[in-house]
Design a protein with these regions (language model features):
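N-terminal leader/targeting segments and the immediate start of mature chains
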Residues: 8-56, 60, 65, 191-195
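Short, exposed beta-strand/loop patches in secreted or surface proteins that constitute
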Residues: 29-31, 56-61, 81-82, 123-132, ...
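Flexible, processing/modification-adjacent segments and terminal tails
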Residues: 32, 41, 45, 90-149
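An acidic-aromatic
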Residues: 60-112
């Protein structure tokens, strides 16, 4: 963990960094130590020709099984995606359908939360700053490959509450085009053993 924080300090300007940079490092340390989290989410998945909106209840665990239960639209409410290790499956009314291992290069609404949390914990911080989202001040953290130019490859933007450190929103982009957007409410961290 110390190495990850030192590398992050380098990209954020090192000692004497701004308030936003220090806040980003504090949040990263907290997310590295967390055992899990719960939240409600609104997810938009944009596949170019098709856009899907979902309401989702999330229970994510660092160890063991995580669950994403669809709450909207009504015609698929109750469908639950379960994630454990490298395995994912869908479950509804007791029936279970295997979907096979997650593809490391693939991205779907089901895999978006683990991807967002991975960026929060270990993603290269390309930029961070305080900005206004709606009517509140938030911390925005932009992550991407350190060798990539902005707008190329996969990028991630994360917005955090500066007081509670709750994840408020996350966006995943591919080549400058936002493909997944998650807006979180009631985000609660479960501290790790050291927390």
């Amino acid at each position: 963990m110390t190495i990850a924080l030192c590398l992050t300090l380098t990209c954020c300007g090192g000692e004497g960094g701004s308030q936003a940079e220090q806040l980003a490092l504090d949040i990263r340390a907290e997310y590295l130590e967390m055992a899990g989290c719960t939240a409600s989410m609104e997810v938009t998945a944009d596949y170019g020709q098709r856009v899907y909106d979902f309401g989702v209840d999330l229970t994510w665990q660092r160890e063991g099984e995580s669950a994403l239960t669809i709450t909207a639209p009504e015609n698929v409410a109750g469908v639950t995606a379960r994630l454990a290790q490298d395995q994912a499956y869908l479950e509804y009314d007791g029936a279970r359908v295997e979907t096979g291992p997650l593809d490391d290069t693939g991205l779907s609404p089901v895999s978006s939360v683990p991807v967002l949390l991975d960026y929060a914990q270990t993603g290269y911080i390309a930029a961070c700053g305080l900005e206004t989202l709606g009517e509140r001040e938030v911390l925005r953290v932009d992550c991407r490959d350190p060798e990539a130019q902005p707008g190329t490859g996969r990028e991630c933007a994360l917005w955090f509450d500066p007081d509670t450190h709750a994840l408020l929103r996350g966006e995943l982009s591919q080549d400058g085009y936002t493909v997944i957007q998650c807006t979180f409410s009631d985000f609660q961290l479960t501290p790790g053993a050291e927390g």
